[in-house]
Amino acid sequence: MYSFNTLRFYLWETIVFFSLAASKEAEAARSAPKPMSPSDFLDKLMGRTSGYDARIRPNFKGPPVNVSCNIFINSFGSIAETTMDYRVNIFLRQQWNDPRLAYNEYPDDSLDLDPSMLDSIWKPDLFFANEKGAHFHEITTDNKLLRISRNGNVLYSIRITLTLACPMDLKNFPMDVQTCIMQLESFGYTMNDLIFEWQEQGAVQVADGLTLPQFILKEEKDLRYCTKHYNTGKFTCIEARFHLERQMGYYLIQMYIPSLLIVILSWISFWINMDAAPARVGLGITTVLTMTTQSSGSRASLPKVSYVKAIDIWMAVCLLFVFSALLEYAAVNFVSRQHKELLRFRRKRRHHKSPMLNLFQDDEGGEGRFNFSAYGMGPACLQAKDGISVKGANNNNTTNPPPAPSKSPEEMRKLFIQRAKKIDKISRIGFPMAFLIFNMFYWIIYKIVRREDVHNK
């Protein structure tokens, strides 16, 4: 009986103990704080009750905020010489530390927030100093990213398309190398409050397989600081320089080769008979007009600049060679017809000789109407009115050399035609050689000398 009562006592004591333990655990579970929901956490971090003010920068009245910038280029193109600008699509990423956003209450190491939360935090007032036009992307939603880390680091990424000014030096066009810049600057905060700097690794990244229609984007990126000084203070500024080397394929096909063929075509007139005036004149005028049109077309897509470009020199020299070929035929035609002018001059001269000259000339035997030998004048020269000398008798017995026999009209015609043909023969060699020498100097200067000058800048 005693053992049974003892056993029942111990059993009752055990039940009471476990009941008390269970009740304490339930009470502890009820009294333990519930895990904070994301909404409650954000309200506590940057809501109205948090004391966070997006109008005030981090470290207010303290050291400036350092903002690390990074650019990822999605596309690069639409480089326009007439407006001197270029179009680029980029991801702009900014990172800074805001101690007010550091947290320990939430288990995640970082929070990716909705873009609508951007209005609730402070952001740098970055703008592009050489921007001519820009727009954000909102398809299918705002292309923006906001990420907050446990230590208060903030990552702000945004996708934008920019049209940026790019002053170009077209002296070497179309063998030029252009440098286009992108300047990132603070609009309102001076360097006492905000400093921009490039990210140490991969500050400027380019999408794989990115190609440009007319340019080669060189791999080296020139990153610089461009601090601006205004009346309102000194403002932070950073810039990236993109070196673009123009490809000549399009211009060789559209400008250089056609103009070269037109110049060669103008040389065909040197092998055409000089008597075929319609053919040679028609060919010369056609090549001149074609070359003029080609020269005008080469300037259609370029701005009206005050200096001379490489393409202008090429077109001007080609036009000069074509026009010179036309003038060459004018010279050939003029020389070949000179014998007619000479014969006409001779006939005119004989027609205007004084009739008195016949009184002083001997008739085959020296017995003319007046025989000056009888008067002792000898072979002296009497000067007629038109300058014709007549032999007299008192010239100290000296005689003038007999006049050279004049050439016949046919001989004169052949002489001048040979001279004209000689001009054509010289032109057949002279024009190509002169154009070849010009090409040697042209390509050496623009492809080697000036290119080295550009790279050394």
From Swiss-Prot:
One of its GO terms (biological process) is righting reflex. Strychnine binds at Y230, N231, T232, G233, K234, F235. Residues 29-250, 299-309, 447-457 are extracellular. The record marks L289 as: Important for obstruction of the ion pore in the closed conformation. Glycans are attached at N66. Channel opening is triggered by extracellular glycine. Channel characteristics depend on the subunit composition; heteropentameric channels are activated by lower glycine levels and display faster desensitization. Channel opening is also triggered by taurine and beta-alanine. Inhibited by strychnine. Strychnine binding locks the channel in a closed conformation and prevents channel opening in response to extracellular glycine. Inhibited by picrotoxin. Channel activity is enhanced by 5 uM Zn(2+) and inhibited by 100 uM Zn(2+). Glycine 2 binds at T232. Residues 391-410 are annotated as: Disordered. GO terms for cellular component: chloride channel complex; dendrite; external side of plasma membrane; glycinergic synapse; inhibitory synapse; intracellular membrane-bounded organelle; membrane; neuron projection. The keyword Transmembrane helix applies. Detected in spinal cord neurons. Detected in brain stem neurons. Detected at lower levels in hippocampus and cerebellum. Detected in the inner plexiform layer of the retina (at protein level). Residues 1-28 form the signal peptide. One of its GO terms (molecular function) is glycine binding. Keywords: Cell membrane, Cell projection, Chloride, Chloride channel, Disease variant, Disulfide bond, Glycoprotein, Ion channel, Ion transport, Ligand-gated ion channel, Membrane, Metal-binding, Postsynaptic cell membrane, Receptor, Signal, Synapse, Transmembrane, Transmembrane helix, Transport, Zinc. Zn(2+) binds at E220, D222, H243. Glycine 1 binds at R93, S157. It is found in: Postsynaptic cell membrane; Synapse; Perikaryon; Cell projection, Dendrite. Residues 273-277, 331-425 are cytoplasmic. It catalyses: chloride(in) = chloride(out). Disulfide bonds join C166-C180, C226-C237. The alpha subunit binds strychnine. Belongs to the ligand-gated ion channel (TC 1.A.9) family. Glycine receptor (TC 1.A.9.3) subfamily. GLRA1 sub-subfamily. Subunit of heteromeric glycine-gated chloride channels. Plays an important role in the down-regulation of neuronal excitability. Contributes to the generation of inhibitory postsynaptic currents. Channel activity is potentiated by ethanol. Potentiation of channel activity by intoxicating levels of ethanol contribute to the sedative effects of ethanol. This is Glycine receptor subunit alpha-1. The gene is Glra1.
